[in-house]
Amino acid sequence: MLDIKNPIEARKVIRKNEYRNQTAGTANKYVQGNLCILPSKYAMDFASFCQKNPKPCPLIGFGTKGDPSLKDLGDIDIRTDVPQYRIWEKGKIIDEPYDIKKYWNEDLTTFVLGCSMSFELPLIEAGIPIQHIENDTIVPMYRTSIDCEPAGQFSGKLVVSMRPLNSKDAIRSIQISSRFPAVHGAPIHLGDPSEIGIKDIMNPEYGDPPKAFKNNEIPVFWACGVTPQSVLQDSKPDFCITHAPGKMLITDKLNNDLAAL
């Protein structure tokens, strides 16, 4: 884990390519974001997709065409300020670079979506253990059987993140995360993973496998901002750039600024 509390300093380290791993727990009072960068011909459809699917795709920022800065979110250069990226062509990953300078062009538009890491600090402050933070791993994420609402070219399956919790902590996590609708809000499911199409809880499509569940723990599932990557596989736009799962954009916005209560 990158143990830096200030988001500006964290981005400086990432910008210099001195840190390439997951960002959970880094600058943990500040909002982290999922990334999707698209050619302008897809921008309106993707914005509509986010509007129709606010649980997995809560839009917290977007850029203007051809501009790599995101002034509303901080002194950000989207070409360098994420630990690792994914380059997509027609639904397939063709590269996973540590910066996107050679891929950037004047026709690209950046979208930043809220991330569940923003409510993990309130969970920890409430005494709720977060397994992937304790183990310095990437939260496990799963492609479900739940369809997103389609918009234009974009359609596909919902992705969820999972945290093992005991029943008491699961109830408390619902109460706490409900305060943060801009970063996925309350869980969409808890308990039997097969009910949402997950065949093997120990084999996530994204992130790292969870450690063994304790006897009193159940899986708790939140809608996840990696959903666009699932949608890209199905919708197959000509070109797209995303973050690598778990390796997020760290912004200057405070988590508490997104709290609804």
UniProtKB/Swiss-Prot annotation:
HAMAP family, alphabetized: Hydro_lyase
Alphabetically ordered keywords of this record: Lyase
InterPro entries per the UniProt record, alphabetical: D-Glu_cyclase, Putative_hydro-lyase, UPF0317
Pfam families (UniProt xref): D-Glu_cyclase
Keyword Lyase: yes
Presence of the UniProt keyword Cell cycle in the record: no
Enzyme class: lyase
Family assignment from sequence similarity: Belongs to the D-glutamate cyclase family.
Entry's Gene Ontology molecular function annotations: lyase activity
Organism, scientific name: Pelagibacter ubique (strain HTCC1062)
EC number: 4.2.1.-
Protein name: Putative hydro-lyase SAR11_0660
